[in-house]
Amino acid sequence: MHYYGNRNEYDILNASSNDSNMSNTYPRYPLANPQQDLMQNTNYKDWLNVCEGYHIENPREASVRAGLGKGLGIVSTIVGFFGGSIILDTIGLFYQISELLWPEDDTQQYTWQDIMNHVEDLIDKRITEVIRGNAIRTLADLQGKVDDYNNWLKKWKDDPKSTGNLSTLVTKFTALDSDFNGAIRTVNNQGSPGYELLLLPVYAQIANLHLLLLRDAQIYGDKWWSARANARDNYYQIQLEKTKEYTEYCINWYNKGLNDFRTAGQWVNFNRYRREMTLTVLDIISMFPIYDARLYPTEVKTELTREIYSDVINGEIYGLMTPYFSFEKAESLYTRAPHLFTWLKGFRFVTNSISYWTFLSGGQNKYSYTNNSSINEGSFRGQDTDYGGTSSTINIPSNSYVYNLWTENYEYIYPWGDPVNITKMNFSVTDNNSSKELIYGAHRTNKPVVRTDFDFLTNKEGTELAKYNDYNHILSYMLINGETFGQKRHGYSFAFTHSSVDPNNTIAANKITQIPVVKASSINGSISIEKGPGFTGGDLVKMRADSGLTMRFKAELLDKKYRVRIRYKCNYSSKLILRKWKGEGYIQQQIHNISPTYGAFSYLESFTITTTENIFDLTMEVTYPYGRQFVEDIPSLILDKIEFLPTN
């Protein structure tokens, strides 16, 4: 089902009244063809002719969008499954994901074709027919064997006492494990050299399924190999090794593609590649650790705190993007530096006008940190009222989030220098019970405008537009560039975070709860937020000597006991002090002497707590045995997540 309709259509309405509207859904492919030169040398009539090409979305465009939507849907399925009330159900996550990748009527591998088409258009390269054919044949063969395994797993669950069912199932499992190894070799740098980036999302999906299959060996292994005590352990070691191998492969090739765009100075392409590979590769591999059924034997409430950025509105206009200024300048103008996780609370906008053109000339975000009632104001970007104009505010109601939006900006008509700034924004806001629209409007109806929609703002399955009770991302920040080409030309980008993030840091009653430490409510001392490596699902907190942070939590159920566990890495011996607070005083304390992990993440088992209050704080402080000065310039304690494991 194609859910974008003709929102990609450019409609020119009633030229006699000089009122026109253009619709601009993106990402616009291919990446390797920036349109600055085209726009600078195209007159109005020619530009309208260019727009005619986007009148109806063709099958290729539909396939490309479906490939992106599949990545969105699979991540949401994983998050939803692990957060469900029963994890060892009769279907299983392996079955659910395989059904998404191989729908019942998909005999032509259309889903996998969509995934390949998406990456082809993303990086403007093509997979040869030979390479594509090899991959499709391998996937078709794998489909039959996956279906066979799923069928025998169901038969065994329906009749677990049947030794015949069990024997056949174990044989199917062993063969399928080998088949996955073969499929990986078909799409990796050995089987398809030179096509590693083009096949990377395919590789990630195959790797994901393989690890879920190996997870089955941990869930059912004590019954499958009751007479072979070491079989389950052997497959566990294989799962650990494959998790490392698959993660490193995806990160290495993702970074290579990213660096190719960075080296070429193509920030627009760099940002789009980063966003869409996050949605189709990095989000998936960030789930791999929770497939470890020994570390995570029950349901897991998990979150993705990474931030993605839209294409830049007006990014094709000269003066607002590279090569007019440096790659680093573009990154600072249109994205945020690493930061504690924030919740958008509203905006202050400044509206100005030049002649008959009225537009958004500057703005400021209002936000808060998790479980922190203080409202912070971001830096003002663009032109404030010092340049004239009026100020207005938009406030997002408490416990509400922007799940969709669209914008309108004045159309660029070469060679005139009229403003191309935003004139209208429509924010769709949800409290998860209903929706309301908050509108910024400076629009004059007698001027031609371009409408921009954000195609990655879908429902959780990635198959339809976002709805107030079913959405994948929420707006977290707006960035305005009003400094590189004067008041008539502004560039705008929007930041979004995943809808899995819990605004209250709620500790589930009967699930393992993972909460990224970047969701601290406050930090102090020599502490910084570091860009995540790509496989953690978000940024990390780096603590130096004599630094500390506070995290506030909400207990779903009182009088529950939990083991507290921290995922961290450290290249130097340090001391971590954890305290649980009640009011102004702490009621529990645990001091840990931490040894170096030499670059790898490890788990620290801390104290056991009881949820005696609905809301409580935990603090973390770091000291070093040789003092601040000695370790000031070396890597420090890096924290990823804090976890709460029900003791029962």
UniProtKB/Swiss-Prot annotation:
Database matches in Pfam families: Endotoxin_C (PF03944), Endotoxin_M (PF00555), Endotoxin_N (PF03945)
Organism encoding this protein: Bacillus thuringiensis subsp. jegathesan
Transmembrane segments: none
Family matches, as InterPro entries: Galactose-bd-like_sf (IPR008979), Pest_crys (IPR038979), Pest_crys_dom-III (IPR005638), Pest_crys_dom_I (IPR005639), Pest_crys_N_sf (IPR036716), Pest_cryst_cen_dom_sf (IPR036399), Pest_cryst_dom_II (IPR001178)
Keyword Nucleotide-binding: no
Entries under PANTHER family matching the protein: ENDOTOXIN_N DOMAIN-CONTAINING PROTEIN-RELATED, PESTICIDAL CRYSTAL PROTEIN N-TERMINAL DOMAIN-CONTAINING PROTEIN
Keyword Secreted belongs to the record: no
Keywords (A to Z) from UniProt: Sporulation, Toxin, Virulence
Family assignment from sequence similarity: Belongs to the delta endotoxin family.
Protein name, UniProt field: Pesticidal crystal protein Cry19Aa
Superkingdom of the organism of origin: Bacteria
Designated gene of the protein: cry19Aa
